[in-house]
From Swiss-Prot:
Protein task: Part of the binding-protein-dependent transport system for D-xylose. Probably responsible for the translocation of the substrate across the membrane.
Topological domains, Periplasmic: 1-24, 86-102, 157-175, 236-239, 309-312, 358-365
The protein's name in its UniProt record: Xylose transport system permease protein XylH
Top-level taxonomic group: Bacteria
Annotated S-S bridges: none
GO-annotated molecular function: transmembrane transporter activity
Similarity annotation: Belongs to the binding-protein-dependent transport system permease family. AraH/RbsC subfamily.
Organism: Escherichia coli (strain K12)
Length: 393
């Protein structure tokens, strides 16, 4: 079924000010922002302010990093109208391989990273080859991968935990940026963002297209600067910006660019929106799907490196049901399981919501079974709201 042309989540305030501007703001983004604010206020109140302490915010963002990186890869798979149930087991396997290379084989860190990333690409491409060229449903292919990858992990580790990782390996998931470095990177990123925003506005004006009012652009940029610099300042009050958070930010920006500014990204949306129309328009569907799964494998490899580094070990149970968290993050972020609709920014925001709930309920000592029930209910509510919104529109 053909779908409307999707676009990456925009946090922009529309051209007109006040309430009329809010009307054209993407409803899903507005709901997610409201949900994040509500979650933060609730847990801040129930924990007497400890939830927004510098230490806990740092831990929260580190929790978000792994699921967020998985969601960056998963969102493209789902947009292409496919699914990947193997990412949890694949992450455990790749993290286990990294730990074996580091602990048992004593390889230097650069070689360990390269081998892990290449293996992630190959495993993702393996899934993609079966889906794209052998026409096996992705649900079956990745379900088989989930079982096989877990079995391989248990086999190569002999069912034991591979530890401890080296100090160099631990830097990936446990290190923090110096305070000055965090502010410099944040300032450079904001400068690039401001320049990109004004460049886009001037190009639209030159083409005679409607462009946002200058006051709206300045307001959006000021709000972004306050949020970014405020977050860096808060994180520096503890130990600094965690390295996994920096990696997630870079992958988020790269994913957003690929989704909105490249022909490859547009092909992914076209395939998910209407497969036959995409094929008739000249898109190489098989090659595109293969590339999507390979990219997903690369994201899983990065997440696996961070996980093993953060744990200081490779565990046979690592990554268990992580694929469900990644899928839930994408769905909560507005990605349609039917394909053709979704955004990288929304998926990462969904991952942040999931991590916020985990973190807050853990601080409140909520029993584990209730945590699963709450997350399941929120996932169901998010899908229902998305379906209800589409029916009304």
């Amino acid at each position: 079924m053909s779908k409307s042309n999707p676009s990456e989540v925009k946090l922009a305030v529309p051209t007109s000010g006040g309430f009329s501007g809010l009307k054209s703001l993407n409803l899903q983004v507005f709901v997610m922002i409201a949900a994040i604010i509500a979650i933060m206020l609730f847990f801040t109140w129930t924990t007497d302010g400890a939830y927004l302490s510098a230490r806990n915010v740092s831990n929260l963002l580190r929790q978000t990093a792994i699921t967020g990186i998985l969601a960056v890869g998963m969102v493209f798979v789902i947009i292409s109208a496919e699914i990947d149930l193997s990412v949890g087991s694949m992450m455990g396997l790749l993290g286990g391989v990294a730990a074996i290379c580091d602990v048992w084989l004593g390889w230097p860190l650069p070689l360990t990273i390269i081998v892990t990333l290449v293996l992630g690409l190959l495993l993702g491409a393996w899934n993609g080859w079966w889906v794209a060229y052998r026409k096996v449903p992705s649900f079956i292919v990745t379900l088989a991968g989930m079982l096989a990858f877990r079995g391989i992990l248990i086999g190569i580790t002999n069912g034991t935990t591979v530890s401890p990782t080296s100090a160099a390996m631990s830097q990936i998931g446990q290190s923090y940026l110096p305070a000055s470095t965090g502010f410099i990177i944040g300032a450079l990123g904001l400068m690039a963002f401001v320049g990109w925003q004004w460049r886009g506005r001037m190009r639209r004006q030159a083409l005679g297209l409607q462009s946002p009012a200058s006051t709206a652009v300045v307001g959006r940029q000021a709000l972004t600067a306050i949020i970014v610099l405020g977050a860096i300042w808060l994180l520096n009050d503890y130990r600094g910006v965690p390295t996994p958070v920096l990696l997630l930010t870079l992958l988020l920006l790269g994913g957003m660019f690929m989704a909105t500014r490249t022909a490859f990204g547009r092909r992914i949306y076209a395939i998910g929106g209407n497969l036959e129309a995409a094929r008739l328009s000249g898109i190489n569907v098989e090659r595109t799907k293969l590339a999507v799964f390979a990219i997903n494998g690369l994201m899983v490899a990065i997440a696996g490196l961070i996980l093993s580094s953060r744990l200081g070990a490779g565990s046979p149970s690592a990554g268990n049901i992580a694929e469900l968290d990644a899928i839930a993050a994408c769905v909560i972020g507005g990605t349609s399981l039917a394909g053709g609709v979704g955004s990288v920014a929304g998926a990462v925001m969904g991952a942040f919501i999931m991590a916020s709930l985990d973190n807050g309920m853990s601080m409140m000592d909520v029993p584990t079974f209730w945590q699963y029930i709450v997350k399941g209910a929120i996932l169901l509510l998010a899908v229902w709201m998305d379906s209800a919104t589409k029916r009304r529109s």
